[in-house]
Amino acid sequence: MVFIPRAKTYETVNPEYSNYAGEAFGNFQAMLADIPETLGETIPDFHNMEFRLKQLREAVAKDAAGRVSEVKYYLDEIEKRADEMCKAERLYREGKLPKRVCHCDTKVNNMMFDEDGKVLCVIDLDTVMPSFVFSDYGDFLRTG
């Protein structure tokens, strides 16, 4: 492990630092673009929406905490969108959407900044595996 002196991490950043962070994740994607999708999955089905919906439906059917009725509206909204939410996996199976090596946890606190707010490196690489690039992009927008 390498120690990087004066490096900082942040939970939230200003727009300028966010810009640097977005550029760094873009560079990260570009550097990994030629690595084949055959890289192993570190967390199977981590970003697989079909799998996640199946898990949700199983949890709803069990209603272990007895609260499903309290969130029925939200569950109905999810079901209305389920087909669209699973579109990426279908397109992938049809050979119409590729998977690329992605970070899969793209958030601003998974990079180290210098004193001027420039990104030194992307960290927390335990989730690097094949996924959809737009998942990394969306994950970063959620936190950036």
Model-found features: residue ranges?
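Activation of the activation-loop gatekeeper triad in protein kinase-fold domains
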Residues: 123-128
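ATP-dependent phospho-/nucleotidyl transfer catalytic cores
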Residues: 4-19, 24, 34-103, 110-116
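Active-site activation/catalytic loop segments of kinase-like enzymes and analogous catalytic loops
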Residues: 134-144
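A conserved long alpha-helix in the C-terminal portion of kinase-like catalytic domains
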Residues: 117-120, 144
